[in-house]
Regions:
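Long amphipathic alpha-helical segments
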Residues: 1-76
Length: 76
């Protein structure tokens, strides 16, 4: 996995919205495949889901993660 891919995963999973959106935009602008970016988002969402199940995240974090995914999806 490339460094920027891991950074995107971490930004989404850690609720760093501005960073996640900027990384996704940069990856797309650099020619990364939109489906790859969305696949990374899906992987990050799995982490968010696990953190929710473990009680680390609550409903507001799920909503924020969904909003990030939607905004990145609109870019792709």
């Amino acid at each position: 996995m490339k460094e920027n891919e891991q950074r995107l995963l971490d930004a989404i999973a850690d609720m760093r919205e501005d960073e996640a959106l900027a990384l996704a935009r940069a990856m797309l602008d650099a020619g990364d495949a939109p489906l790859r970016v969305l696949e990374l988002c899906r992987t990050a969402m799995e982490t968010v889901g696990k953190r929710f199940q473990e009680g680390e995240y609550f409903l507001p974090e799920l909503i924020l993660a969904g909003e990030m995914l939607e905004r990145i999806g609109d870019m792709a």
